[in-house]
Amino acid sequence: MTVRKNQATLTADEKRRFVAAVLELKRSGRYDEFVTTHNAFIIGDTDAGERTGHRSPSFLPWHRRYLLEFERALQSVDASVALPYWDWSADRTARASLWAPDFLGGTGRSLDGRVMDGPFAASAGNWPINVRVDGRAYLRRSLGTAVRELPTRAEVESVLGMATYDTAPWNSASDGFRNHLEGWRGVNLHNRVHVWVGGQMATGMSPNDPVFWLHHAYVDKLWAEWQRRHPGSGYLPAAGTPDVVDLNDRMKPWNDTSPADLLDHTAHYTFDTD
């Protein structure tokens, strides 16, 4: 069984293996397919129309399946690799270990945001940004520039305390746990982290930055934590809702899985705190 660990506890060998598997997916072209898929859903998901991956109840199960697909791709390269998670409520600064040169590399230079160190820096030659909106083919970051602070544990706790999964109108205006975790309302959790990292992470092509996977692995963990705290509160909406994915509806682009199929993460992996 795959165990997803806090990135802060990874050994040097675990970091090396994760990075090597990510680089191999990039070299083979498979990595960029994940970027293309994510961007297509960011563009297509709207508050007033069909919405699947974002600003909708299926934000959490959609990304759970998306991360599972990526994790399986990594494991096809190296069976020992699991997705680590980044607890940004604890590792809150640009000096945190995940930004070190032996793992993800650090922030970008002030001139153009170009990441200058680590395995994904343009100078290393292994990480061209191919799925992009402009001519800049290098990984960019500006940690803590567009927004200064990452979410705190107290802010996370305030969202975990919400007893209702989601509410009408089932979009970025909704009340409830999902929308506050996604970050369109309230203390702005998930969305704020994308903006804090900056560069490609602040765009629909956010998976171009490998930190995307660690960020979403933690968002996924928070969903599991919420489920444990609110065993009587299930996924909503249940049925008959236009434009969104109900509990037993199939999710695009896979069309073979529903939110109901993904409610129990332990069927696929566990966290180091489970």
UniProtKB/Swiss-Prot annotation:
Disulfide bridges in this chain: none
Any matching Pfam family: Tyrosinase
Requisite cofactors: Cu(2+)
A biological-process GO annotation: melanin biosynthetic process
Catalytic activity: 2 L-dopa + O2 = 2 L-dopaquinone + 2 H2O; L-tyrosine + O2 = L-dopaquinone + H2O
Molecular function per GO: metal ion binding; tyrosinase activity
Entries under InterPro entries matching the protein: Di-copper_centre_dom_sf, Tyrosinase/Hemocyanin, Tyrosinase_Cu-bd
Co-factor remark: Binds 2 copper ions per subunit.
Annotated Gene3D superfamilies: Di-copper center containing domain from catechol oxidase
Residues binding Cu cation A: H38, H54, H63
Effect of H38Q: Loss of activity
UniProtKB keywords: Copper, Melanin biosynthesis, Metal-binding, Monooxygenase, Oxidoreductase
Keyword Membrane: no
Enzyme class: oxidoreductase
Further remarks about this protein from its record: The extra- and intra-cellular tyrosinases are identical.
Chain's role: This is a copper-containing oxidase that functions in the formation of pigments such as melanins and other polyphenolic compounds.
Family: Belongs to the tyrosinase family.
Protein name (Swiss-Prot/TrEMBL): Tyrosinase
Species of provenance: Streptomyces glaucescens
Gene transcribed to yield this protein: melC2
